[in-house]
Amino acid sequence: MQNKKIKVILLVAGEGKRLRPYTLDRPKCMVEIEGKSLIERQLEVLKNEGLNDVVMIGGYNCEMLKKYGYKIIENSRYFETNMLWTLFCAEGELEGDVIVSYGDIVYSKRVIKALLDSNSDIAVTIDKDWESYWRSRNEDPLDDAETLKIRKDGTISEIGQKPKSLDEIEGQYMGLMKFSDRGLKQIKEIFHSSIKDINILGKDAENAYMTDLLQAAIVQNNKVMAVPVFGEWIEVDTVSDLQSTTTKKRIQL
């Protein structure tokens, strides 16, 4: 199977300071679990779904990514910018249908298939079974969680804010999304407008998260569709994540 018309952009510029010493000599995405790196695990899932048109946007120790044989674009300002800025370092690649994925996550084939099945212009995977996973990573799940509210029609009405209670979290944002060409035009307009007007994202574009972009899209009445999944993914942010039995159990996707 070949998904030739779908490009995948991997945001792999991260330094992974909270994963030191494991990231002293490599990008965050190249940290290994059970003998295989996060990025290798992700590429394996993508390849099995026929997703071979991959672009990596690197930063920290960017040259190490060359071993994978894919196109690399460098965010030379990785140390002072955030996810959204990293994505737009590859603005020339934002055409047609594009999957955008963080580099510090791994997901199962069922997760990527659910995303591929969505016909929405902006589709975002969310973990409905997030709470038990978050409790295994944090004493208080609200410490590292963000709001995510979903309308009856399945579109997201709010994302990325600080929650006051668990009731404001109807799923966990995973860092995996898909845009149609129309959806890409919508986010490009938001991004370029935000450079001139800091109020659009609530912060300057250089320091904005992807969730800031998605929230701005929602505010401007663009449909952002939730793609619900139930577990079958991991995120590795800290040494504790890397070493936990939960991570090692869930990595058997």
Language-model features, listed with the residues they occupy:
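Conserved beta-strand segments of alpha/beta enzyme cores
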Residues: 29, 53, 71, 155, ...
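Conserved core of the sugar-phosphate nucleotidyltransferase
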Residues: 68, 109-190
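Phosphate- and divalent-cation-binding pockets in alpha/beta enzyme and binding domains
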Residues: 18, 64-65, 110, 186, ...
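Conserved N-terminal catalytic core of the sugar/cofactor nucleotidyltransferase
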Residues: 1-10, 18, 32, 36-100, ...
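Short alpha-helical oligomerization interface
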Residues: 24-28
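Conserved alpha/beta core of the MobA/IspD/sugar-nucleotide pyrophosphorylase nucleotidyltransferase superfamily
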Residues: 2-8, 159-160, 166-253
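A structural signal for short hydrophobic beta-strand segments in well-ordered beta-sheet cores
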Residues: 30, 148-150, 226
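The conserved acidic donor/metal-binding loop of glycosyltransferases
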Residues: 103-105
